[in-house]
From Swiss-Prot:
Pfam families (alphabetical): AdoMet_dc
Cross-referenced PANTHER family: S-ADENOSYLMETHIONINE DECARBOXYLASE PROENZYME
Any one of the GO CC terms: cytosol
Site (Cleavage (non-hydrolytic)): K111, S112
Organism per entry: Klebsiella pneumoniae (strain 342)
SUPFAM superfamilies in the cross-refs: S-adenosylmethionine decarboxylase (SSF56276)
Protein name as it appears in the record: S-adenosylmethionine decarboxylase proenzyme
Entry-linked Gene3D superfamilies: S-adenosylmethionine decarboxylase
Family: Belongs to the prokaryotic AdoMetDC family. Type 2 subfamily.
Swiss-Prot/TrEMBL catalytic activity: S-adenosyl-L-methionine + H(+) = S-adenosyl 3-(methylsulfanyl)propylamine + CO2
Post-translational modification: Is synthesized initially as an inactive proenzyme. Formation of the active enzyme involves a self-maturation process in which the active site pyruvoyl group is generated from an internal serine residue via an autocatalytic post-translational modification. Two non-identical subunits are generated from the proenzyme in this reaction, and the pyruvate is formed at the N-terminus of the alpha chain, which is derived from the carboxyl end of the proenzyme.
Residues annotated with Pyruvic acid (Ser) modification: S112
Length: 264
């Protein structure tokens, strides 16, 4: 896409939001409580602040304020307000390719924010535990928050990821012509590195005329030992392993497709 000569500030708002899910099987109530405590500590407010601070570094944002909170009995949230940073638009790379992991990218941002909220949960029956983190990176300016996508997916290793990217508003060029997007994008997947693509099955649902892009990701490899909390698969019978595997796969598919799957 040809570089635009704008009249004034770039008023486009670019929002990247995604949910990441981590699934676990905990056999007993004690194990379920242990998993929730473990994941709650792993993604506490301090760690999330470190991740979001590095995200700001990747997209070149100046941090104005950080609000963070751990919650009882579990969960955490962090919100960072960021400000614009002067930049020569000619230096901004708008091409459709994976972002850094991490690498400094200068951005031009205003009225922008980055936030994350976590939601650990479990059910007393069935042994399933899930951890969900909601992340949003919203910027106004010449750079897309998609540049931070690679870093965030690597930092929050997940079984399932759902990603939404939307460009809102418009900006004017020097001739007064309105532009409703200022960079090329066919798929969010084009902003992911090859190592991420090799790990997940992915599907897109895009509404190009509305500048709305959606990608869902489901981990390809399934190894039961990675989903057991304080229990080794070899300690279980073959029948128990099959029941747990079927239970986990059903849970993951329901989250991935966003609907309940009837038992067969």
């Amino acid at each position: 896409m040809k570089k635009l000569k704008l009249h004034g500030f770039n008023n486009l708002t670019k929002s990247l939001s995604f949910c990441i899910y981590d699934i676990c099987y905990a056999k007993t109530a004690e194990e379920r409580d242990g998993y929730i405590a473990y994941i709650d500590e792993l993604y506490n407010a301090n760690r999330l602040t470190e991740i979001l601070t590095e995200t700001c570094s990747i997209i070149g944002a100046n941090i104005l304020n950080i609000a963070r909170q751990d919650y009882e009995p579990q969960g955490a949230s962090v919100t960072i307000l960021v400000s614009e940073e002067p930049v020569d638009p000619k230096l901004i790379d708008q091409t459709e390719h994976p972002g850094p992991l991490p690498e400094t990218v200068v951005a031009h941002l205003d009225k922008s924010h980055i936030c994350v909220h976590t939601y650990p949960e479990s059910h007393p029956e069935g042994g399933l535990c899930t951890f969900r983190a909601d992340i949003e990176v919203s910027t106004c300016g010449v750079i897309s928050p998609l540049k931070a996508l690679n870093y965030l997916i690597h930092q929050l290793e997940s079984d399932i990821v759902t990603i939404d990217y939307r460009v809102r508003g418009f900006t004017r060029d020097i001739n007064g012509m309105k532009h409703f997007i200022d960079h090329e994008i066919n798929s969010i997947q084009n902003f992911m590195s090859d190592d991420i693509k090799s790990l997940y099955d992915m599907v897109d649902v895009n509404v190009y005329q509305e500048n709305i892009f959606h990608t869902k990701m489901l981990l390809k490899e399934f190894d039961l030992k990675h989903y057991m909390f304080h229990t080794r698969p070899e300690e279980l019978t073959a029948e128990e392993r099959k029941v747990i595997t079927d239970l986990l796969w059903k849970e993951m598919r329901e989250i991935y497709y966003g609907r309940n799957i009837p038992a067969v």
